[in-house]
Amino acid sequence: MKALRSSSRLSRWREWAAPLWVGCNFSAWMRLLIRNRFAVHHSRWHFAVLYTFLSMVNSCLGLWQKIVFGRRVAETVIADPPIFIVGHWRTGTTLLHELLVVDDRHTGPTGYECLAPHHFLLTEWFAPYVEFLVSKHRAMDNMDLSLHHPQEDEFVWCMQGLPSPYLTIAFPNRPPQYEEYLDLEQVAPRELEIWKRTLFRFVQQVYFRRRKTVILKNPTHSFRIKVLLEVFPQAKFIHIVRDPYVVYPSTIHLHKALYRIHGLQQPTFDGLDDKVVSTYVDLYRKLDEGRELVDPTRFYELRYEDLIGDPEGQLRRLYQHLGLGDFECYLPRLRQYLADHADYKTNSYQLTVEQRAIVDEHWGEIIDRYGYDRHTPEPARLRPAVGG
């Protein structure tokens, strides 16, 4: 009984102190509140108080890191161009990211590094002491979550007061935030240079820390391949696609979970379904444009269902195509990861007739292009590797 009460208190604390905005520096936090006219719901008042204090701490630590590490990071040469995992939300980008960083020649930015980009070089040793704030599983599915798991780098811009579409999560009932920063095409030259410098500096920091090939996973980068190539001309790209009939309800569920947990308002979800439909179409339009700019030897594509069905075979082909080194050196770690996660089950969704018609009408081209059966559901388990 005592353990149950303790667990309940811990769950309430995690809800009370949801960690997404905990890494904002003072200017980031103030800009977010002012831009949205301090429209914080009364049930979220504690966020405004807690994060105002923490944001000042983050700003001080950021200045300290710049003094201690700024010069050394700036002088760091990124010897290995980064690898970008692109694709729509809920298509398996996180799974692929985790599979690839199992290889000890690769690394990905951790949750702590993405939420504290301005001072993680100084304070990452402290991350285990605040791990209790984080749920052990993601809000939208059953995948493991912690501050040391790889995370999306989009939060790097949010935490430093720079524009990002992800700021919509904080105020979901307000107009969408910074949509022009999805593809960056309408961003003024000065702001675009700031965006590029932020990306380059963050990759420098991660590379400085571990001296390994940095793998970044960020669905919004699917819109930005042209700009990514301007920053890293030799970058490699991996695109993963998944059954659109699964992606549609799963993406809606993702947004609802993020808005409920990390929003500073009580979300109404007005227009959410339509937004998911249109964003998907726009993403694949920009992804198709971007891939034309990449040398085919540096762009690889796979289906989530094929990865789940034969992870070892799919990753072996990926390694060969992109020239990622000796696959056999990676194989023991890969097999261990697969064995450890063999019981993982994905969420299942039942589409209404109306929802299926929406997917058919708007996403039919992607369904046909990637050979998806309009009636057959995907497998739900990650199959462990067998034999050689």
UniProtKB/Swiss-Prot annotation:
Gene3D superfamilies: P-loop containing nucleotide triphosphate hydrolases
Keyword Transmembrane helix: no
GO MF annotations, alphabetized: sulfotransferase activity
Reaction(s) catalysed by this chain's protein: omega-hydroxy-beta-dihydromenaquinone-9 + 3'-phosphoadenylyl sulfate = omega-sulfo-beta-dihydromenaquinone-9 + adenosine 3',5'-bisphosphate + H(+)
Pfam families in the cross-refs: Sulfotransfer_3
Phenotype on disruption: Deletion mutant does not synthesize SMK and shows a hypervirulent phenotype in the mouse model of infection. Mutant has significantly higher levels of menaquinone-9 (MK-9), an essential component in the electron-transport chain in M.tuberculosis.
Superkingdom field: Bacteria
EC numbers: 2.8.2.40
Keywords attached to this entry: Transferase
GO terms of biological process kind: sulfolipid biosynthetic process
Function: Involved in the biosynthesis of sulfomenaquinone (SMK, initially named S881 on the basis of its mass), which is localized in the outer envelope of M.tuberculosis and negatively regulates its virulence. Catalyzes the transfer of a sulfonate group from 3'-phosphoadenosine-5'-phosphosulfate (PAPS) to omega-hydroxy-beta-dihydromenaquinone-9, generating omega-sulfo-beta-dihydromenaquinone-9 (sulfomenaquinone).
Family to which the UniProt record says this protein belongs: Belongs to the Stf3 family.
Protein name: Omega-hydroxy-beta-dihydromenaquinone-9 sulfotransferase Stf3
Organism the protein comes from: Mycobacterium tuberculosis (strain ATCC 25618 / H37Rv)
